Regions:
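Active-site proximal loop and beta-alpha junction motif in alpha/beta enzyme cores
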Residues: 2-145, 155-204
Length: 204
């Protein structure tokens, strides 16, 4: 969503620094921090509320919330928590990332039958009282260097489980950092940068 917002602003499709984007996961409200030279320095997105209800994720475990549940993935026991952040997310909190092969465990868990619509899988390590390192396996796409909804879901779960008590949390993904603010009833605001890395043209 941040990359899309940057694209439409940079290409003058949208000329205001505040606008909304209608997505399959609802309407997202964007605010751009524009620098002195007219370039975007930061983007803030209202991601709406996290949905903790298991039936809405959807997850077939018959509990109100899917928090710190245990499942066997391959031959390894996995403890995970899950929410709907526009799309399904399962987060595994680890002490060290070498506890799991992110690609193997992520691929298997994406398709496990308790998630009838499949799930994104996040591996998260709390490194400070306001900081989380995260690696993400995205459903249908595989390993990704960054996932905005995954960062939002993981920050909300860390807060809900008491792993982090602060309302402003830094997420360190492999592709960069995001800042997540947790508001009333777990309404989430995501802030971060977006950078253009290349331009291309489709030829007929």
């Amino acid at each position: 969503i941040r990359c899309f917002a940057k694209f439409v602003y940079d290409n003058e499709i949208v000329k205001k620094n505040e606008f909304s984007v209608e997505t399959d996961a609802g309407i997202k409200y964007i605010k751009l921090d524009i620098g002195a030279l007219g370039a975007i320095e930061y983007l803030k997105v209202n991601m709406e509320k996290v949905d903790f209800k298991g039936k809405n994720i959807p997850c077939t475990i018959e509990k109100e919330n899917i928090l710190e549940e245990e499942i066997m993935i391959g031959n390894k026991k996995v403890i995970f928590s899950s929410v709907l952040m526009g799309v399904p997310h399962a987060t595994i909190f680890v002490e060290n990332f070498d506890e799991y092969d992110v690609n193997e465990t992520g691929s298997l868990m994406e398709k496990v039958d308790i998630f009838p619509e499949k799930t994104n899988v996040n591996f998260a390590k709390v490194t400070a009282d306001d900081t989380i390192m995260i690696k993400t396996w995205e459903r249908g796409a595989g390993r990704t260097l960054g996932c905005g909804t995954g960062c939002c879901a993981t920050a909300a779960l860390a807060h809900k489980l008491g792993k982090i008590k602060k309302d402003k949390i830094k997420l360190l993904a492999e592709g960069g950092e995001l800042f997540i603010e947790i508001g009333e009833d777990y309404e989430i605001t995501m802030s971060g940068k977006a950078e253009t890395i290349c331009h291309g043209e489709f030829l007929k």
